């Protein structure tokens, strides 16, 4: 069965249309589709694979590419898109009819699973390793070729279709760091379903709010997650989430982890993964439009409504493929390791989709930097699997350093293939940066991006010849496509080394979010209204004379805990819901290991007879149940009153400064300035 709209035409070298492409239509599954085509173009053009150059670091290629991306983005990204296989060529590279949203590769059709898996097999690379699964918490190591991944993914796609999932439907994934989580992501992408993968560390309340918001037809989960020293039962967490919430999915697909007891299934609702896969029919890729949502990923925010970032398929595929070579400097076939979690944007972009799109081997690590079993774990993984480049958070490096300051446990390993260490997720302090360089003996490069962008905003683009020894404290230069500027509150451009608002001049490049799920008003209001014509990153920082960006702080109330963005407002809401606390403000307290940890300033209710110690114990437990251990909430200071503005707002920046022993300014809007002195005194006594 070949839908008429799949009668693709081949773009000729002159850019015109050639004859119809015959394509192929394998008789597998209900949704057989034409094999995607590569829209041909000159190799080595701007943004293409041929532009990769691991040069001396003069940055001349970077300058050329960045200038081209700003002055002629259509041509630049059109060339980059030639490295992706398309069922139907796009009619327009860029469209800005509905600003601030930019549509990329308009009317083009593709499938990201085809690009990440099938096409490598068709190009004779089916026996190459796609995934290395390394799980010290279960003492398991396994490798999976592209052929093996395709077999699992295509069958799982068949399972989903059998149970009513079709293009445009939503699927929630709540799984640990196991290959089956990646298979589920790719299977959803294969049939055009929209996945929403939720970090396994979130408690039932957080899971419930996301399920209610995304309304999945199916939830895919596993029997257990494994943490050092304990086992997390996922199914009871899902059950509790469904009790709390309103939405009830049609089916729950449960993967029972090997060598552990099987969890009981609810008749009529629950499906056993192994049983379903044993009788599954493989399903082919379903073409989707470039703008079709690939996934919804929830990010912390200051508003009560969940912020579900929508990722458009086409631009994302183009940007990720381009970034693996141009930013990270990798050749197809090399081993790449992003030491993150699939539940975060790094996991989506650079554990799953990015490396597979580029034909790399990706490491899926179910473990920690320390404690699984010790601070030598990262060195072992790098050595055993021949990793060429690692991406991790500074917190992980700090944890290793804290337990093994001289890196004695790492010295037994030979890191001959290791060439670059990239860090992101939080600001990397200079001390951690220098220690990493000395220990790993490779360039250590900080870079900066956000859930909303899906890939780096600033970086040292080593594939384009950027320096591998940038000044300490910076987070790289503007990535091609991201025209980063520093503005004051009056939208005036600031000079070098002047602290201001970090913004990006529109249009945003391919791969950036296209909206917020069921909340387009917030999309426009939060990101584009304060600085018309720009994307507001809501971060503050400055640029130096060479164009390096220094990200200094977050301008909203999101606390970065060990690279995880946690909303202070969500913690406050949880504390207040306990009933013992009348008022509270949560701010980030600087922490040598985690970067920041939340500290609550609490005002007790007058009718509470319990001691402050008892209340603290209770609210810590309450937050853990509501948000999960990922919040890392353990400390509170009890005060008589909180400072407020006349409109009732808490001056977070001033409180954050007090908590961290820094100077602060009392603005004229504060109702009772004397309360600041009381807060300072209570912090000293704590």
UniProtKB/Swiss-Prot annotation:
It is an enzyme of class 6 (ligase). CoA binds at residues 227-230, 624. Residues 1-29 form a transit peptide. It catalyses: acetate + ATP + CoA = acetyl-CoA + AMP + diphosphate; propanoate + ATP + CoA = propanoyl-CoA + AMP + diphosphate; butanoate + ATP + CoA = butanoyl-CoA + AMP + diphosphate. Keywords: Acetylation, ATP-binding, Ligase, Lipid metabolism, Mitochondrion, Nucleotide-binding, Transit peptide. One of its GO terms (cellular component) is mitochondrion. Belongs to the ATP-dependent AMP-binding enzyme family. It is found in: Mitochondrion matrix. It comes from Homo sapiens. The keyword Cell membrane does not apply. SUPFAM superfamilies: Acetyl-CoA synthetase-like (SSF56801). This is Acyl-CoA synthetase short-chain family member 3, mitochondrial. The modification N6-acetyllysine is found at residue 524. Its EC number is 6.2.1.1, 6.2.1.17. Catalyzes the synthesis of acetyl-CoA from short-chain fatty acids. Propionate is the preferred substrate. Can utilize acetate and butyrate with a much lower affinity. Its main location: mitochondrion. The lineage of its organism: Eukaryota, Metazoa, Chordata, Craniata, Vertebrata. ATP binds at residues 425-427, 446-451, 539, 554, 565. The modification N6-succinyllysine is found at residue 518. One of its GO terms (biological process) is ketone body biosynthetic process. GO terms for molecular function: acetate-CoA ligase activity; ATP binding; medium-chain fatty acid-CoA ligase activity; propionate-CoA ligase activity.
């Amino acid at each position: 069965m070949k839908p008429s709209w799949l009668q693709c035409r081949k773009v000729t070298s002159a850019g015109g249309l050639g004859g119809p492409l015959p394509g192929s239509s394998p008789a597998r599954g209900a949704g057989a589709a034409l094999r995607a085509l590569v829209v041909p173009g000159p190799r080595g053009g701007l943004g293409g694979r041929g532009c990769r150059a691991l040069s001396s670091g003069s940055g001349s290629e970077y300058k050329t590419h960045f200038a081209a991306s700003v002055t002629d983005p259509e041509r630049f990204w059109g060339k980059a898109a030639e490295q992706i296989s398309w069922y139907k060529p796009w009619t327009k590279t860029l469209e800005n009819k509905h600003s601030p949203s930019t549509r990329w590769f308009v009317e083009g059709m593709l499938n990201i699973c085809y690009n990440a898996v099938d096409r490598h097999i068709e190009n004779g690379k089916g026996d190459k390793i796609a995934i290395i699964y390394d799980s010290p918490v279960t003492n398991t190591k396994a490798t999976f070729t592209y052929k093996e991944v395709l077999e699992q993914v295509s069958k799982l796609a068949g399972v989903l279709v059998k149970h009513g999932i079709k293009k445009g439907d939503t699927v929630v994934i709540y799984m640990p760091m196991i290959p089956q989580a990646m298979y589920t992501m790719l299977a959803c992408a294969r049939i055009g379903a929209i996945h929403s993968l939720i970090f396994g560390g979130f408690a039932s309340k957080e899971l419930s709010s996301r399920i209610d918001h995304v309304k999945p037809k199916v939830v895919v989960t596993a029997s257990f997650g494994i943490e050092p020293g304990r086992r997390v039962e996922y199914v009871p967490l899902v059950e509790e989430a469904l009790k709390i919430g309103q939405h009830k999915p049609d089916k729950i697909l449960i993967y029972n982890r090997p060598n552990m007891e099987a969890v009981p299934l609810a008749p009529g609702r629950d499906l056993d993964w192994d049983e379903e896969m044993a009788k599954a029919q493989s399903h082919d890729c379903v073409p989707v439009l470039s703008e079709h949502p690939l996934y919804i990923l929830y990010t912390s925010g200051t508003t009560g409504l969940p912020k579900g970032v929508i990722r458009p398929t086409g631009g994302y595929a183009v940007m990720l493929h381009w970034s693996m070579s141009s930013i990270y400097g990798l050749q197809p076939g090399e081993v790449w390791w992003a030491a993150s979690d699939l539940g975060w944007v790094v996991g989506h972009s650079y554990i799953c989709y990015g490396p597979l799109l580029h034909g790399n081997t990706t490491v899926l690590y179910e473990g920690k930097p320390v404690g699984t079993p010790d601070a030598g774990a990262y060195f072992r993984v790098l050595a055993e699997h021949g990793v060429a480049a690692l991406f991790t958070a500074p917190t992980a490096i700090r944890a290793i350093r804290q337990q093994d300051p001289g890196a004695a446990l790492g010295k037994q390993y030979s890191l001959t293939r290791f060439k670059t260490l990239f860090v992101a997720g939080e600001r990397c302090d200079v001390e951690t940066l220098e220690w990493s360089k000395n220990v790993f003996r490779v360039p250590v490069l900080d870079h900066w991006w956000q859930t909303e962008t899906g890939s780096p905003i600033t970086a040292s683009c080593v594939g384009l010849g950027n320096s591998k020894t940038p000044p300490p404290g910076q987070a790289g230069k503007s990535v091609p496509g991201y025209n980063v500027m520093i503005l004051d509150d009056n939208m005036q451009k600031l000079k070098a080394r002047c602290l201001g608002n970090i913004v990006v001049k529109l249009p945003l490049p391919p791969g950036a979010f296209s909206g917020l799920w069921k909340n387009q008003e917030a999309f426009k209001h939060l990101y584009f209204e304060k600085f018309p014509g720009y994307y507001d990153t809501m971060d503050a920082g400055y640029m130096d004379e060479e164009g390096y960006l220094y990200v200094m702080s977050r301008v909203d109330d999101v606390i970065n805990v060990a690279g995880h963005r946690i909303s202070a407002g969500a913690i406050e809401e949880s504390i207040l819901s306990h009933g013992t606390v009348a008022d509270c403000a949560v701010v980030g307290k600087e922490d040598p290991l985690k970067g920041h940890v939340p500290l609550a300033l609490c005002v007790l209710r007058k009718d509470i007879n319990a001691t402050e110690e008892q209340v603290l114990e209770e609210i810590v437990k309450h937050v853990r149940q509501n948000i999960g251990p990922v919040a890392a909430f353990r400390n509170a200071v009890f005060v008589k009153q909180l400072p407020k503005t006349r409109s009732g707002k808490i001056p977070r920046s001033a409180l954050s400064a007090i908590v961290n022993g820094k100077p602060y300014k009392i603005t004229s809007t504060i109702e009772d300035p004397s309360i600041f002195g009381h807060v300072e005194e209570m912090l000293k006594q704590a």
